[in-house]
Each structure stands twice: as C-alpha cells, then as structure tokens.
Amino acid sequence: MRFVVCLSREGFGEFSTDDLTLGRLYEVLAPSESHDMLRIIDDSGEDFLYPASLFEAVEVQEKTATRLHELLAA
C-alpha cells in the first residue's frame, strides 16, 4: 500500500482539484501507466487520476498502512 499527502491544489489545465484537501492523506490505488499521474479516491468518493506533482509520498510501517487502508476505505 502506498500513501501520499496533498500539498498543492494548483490547477493543471483540464484537471479540477476541487475534490482534494490540502494536507489530507490519500491512498494510491493501482499504479497508473504514466509515472507522472496517481490514481486516488478523492473527496468525492470516486477514483481519479491526478498529477503526481500535487502530492508527496508518505512512508508508513506495514501495520500502520493496513490500518490507514481500512480507515480510508470506510
């Protein structure tokens, strides 16, 4: 499991960032084919691709990652 924190909501042309919260932790879903995009479940509850530059990776222990996954999925 991989987690990121949102550090920017700067617009990227066609990408709306209205459903992102600065400072919020998001779980990265299946890896995208493009290394500069991340698929996350945003604040709307739907999964979308966002530019990776809006986020910073967060390293957590496996036990913590499992608990975060369960909490974010609820």
Segments (PLM) and residue ranges:
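C-terminal structural segments of small proteins and small subunits
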Residues: 52-73
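Intrinsically disordered, low-complexity and often Lys/Arg-enriched segments
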Residues: 1, 73-74
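Basic/aromatic-rich interaction segments and small domains that mediate binding to polyanionic partners
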Residues: 3-5, 9-54
